């Protein structure tokens, strides 16, 4: 699963997801892509599940690019813990995704195969997505 090798700070604020994505919203590498239509935190497990599903379906043919990286730590407090005594410990990593962001790209395969592979990956995502073709 994806996670940063090292970070400057162990914990982060939750932040807000306002507006649309202005970065990473164009197809750069492949010919087909999966675009997010809603804002969400996508965990490293979900990213990996989508990548595996696409790889399995496409088999040897084609190439896959993962265009998002989980760089935000999410902290969780132990269950049945009283309030106070600081912030919880980092549990998992998420990628902050805004509408319009490209999640995955594929190339070197036919459109039918790409559409099916990307739809399988889309079912693993916690948000509504859209299949897009470059050009």
Swiss-Prot record:
Pfam family, one: Ribosomal_L16
Principal location: plastid
PROSITE patterns per record: RIBOSOMAL_L16_1, RIBOSOMAL_L16_2
Localization (cell): Plastid, Chloroplast
GO cellular component terms given for this protein: chloroplast; mitochondrial large ribosomal subunit
UniProt keyword ATP-binding present: no
Keyword Translocase: no
Taxonomy, superkingdom: Eukaryota
Keywords noted in UniProt: Chloroplast, Plastid, Ribonucleoprotein, Ribosomal protein
GO biological process, one term: mitochondrial translation
Family: Belongs to the universal ribosomal protein uL16 family.
Cited PANTHER family: 50S/60S RIBOSOMAL PROTEIN L16, LARGE RIBOSOMAL SUBUNIT PROTEIN UL16M
Official protein name in the record: Large ribosomal subunit protein uL16c
Organism: Platanus occidentalis (Sycamore)
Name of encoding gene: rpl16
């Amino acid at each position: 699963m994806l996670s940063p090798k090292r970070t400057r700070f162990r914990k982060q604020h939750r932040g807000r997801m306002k507006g649309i994505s202005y970065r990473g919203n164009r197809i750069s590498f492949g010919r087909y892509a999966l675009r997010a239509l809603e804002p969400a935190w996508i965990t490293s497990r979900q990213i990996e599940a989508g990548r595996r599903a696409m790889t399995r379906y496409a088999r040897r043919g084609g190439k896959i690019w993962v265009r998002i990286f989980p760089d935000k730590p999410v902290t969780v407090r132990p269950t049945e813990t009283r309030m106070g005594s600081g912030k919880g410990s980092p549990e998992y990593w998420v990628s902050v995704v805004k509408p319009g962001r490209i999640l995955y790209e594929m190339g070197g395969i036919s459109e039918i195969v790409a559409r099916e592979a990307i739809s399988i990956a889309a079912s693993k995502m916690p948000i509504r997505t859209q299949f897009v073709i470059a050009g």
